[in-house]
Amino acid sequence: APKRLNAADIALLASMNIAQIPVYKRPTIALLSTGDELVMPGEQPGPDQILASNTYGLAALLNSHGAECRILPIARDTRASLKATFALAAGSDMVLTIGGASVGDHDLVAQVAADIGIRQSFYKIAMRPGKPLMAGAWGDTIMIGLPGNPVSALVCGHIFVLPVVNALLGLPRSAPIRQSAPLAQDVAANGPREHYMRAKFHEGRVHVFERQDSALLSVLAKANILAIRPAFAAPAKQGDRIEYIPL
């Protein structure tokens, strides 16, 4: 079965005088951020502007798992700008759009995607963070539309995009493996969407962070797991087991 080669694998191949082996190419992924409010890191944000952090976090995540990411220029909130930036993504194995997928006057990604022939497979999921997720196909190119909130984009990258990258690399097509451990504190009842809570696995227990706002990258940066609460889950007590996936 296909596998990702580590240092020992490569040393073993060399010791057996195997100079060449067949491999899967690294999938190319075009990252497309949208929004008039965005500026690139290194630029000075104006009033009501924010830094486009999502593309850099996602590129680091996906490159570390074998992808080859290209960060495209920021697309502004016009059909013409979005179409021009989509054109730069032509030929990629996957296009990831970030932002522009929620309901709103300036959320044009779905409209422009339809204009250029992207076939939408689904839009919106019962999950938090990450409700306004979309996916489709643009010829042979996979298209995934991620939410614009920083934590939402990265959580959806872990849950949905990494399995696609693995499939493109010929690795098993499986969702992130869930584990379980006791809670370090009580957790309130959950609402109608499955909740991927930022948490830390420490000394055999799951410590769920109190603040779970989808804009708080500082909390995600401290987390090493996502604790999973099913939709409509009852309150959980300290010591109850909870499922999680490692980050």
Model-predicted segments: where are they?
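Short, glycine/charged-enriched hinge/interface segments at domain edges or termini
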Residues: 1-71, 226
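Generic structural signal for buried aliphatic residues
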Residues: 1-5, 11, 95, 236, ...
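Residue-level signal for inorganic ion chemistry
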Residues: 31, 62, 96, 199, ...
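N-terminal small/polar loop signature for handling phosphorylated ligands or for N-terminal nucleophile
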Residues: 59-115
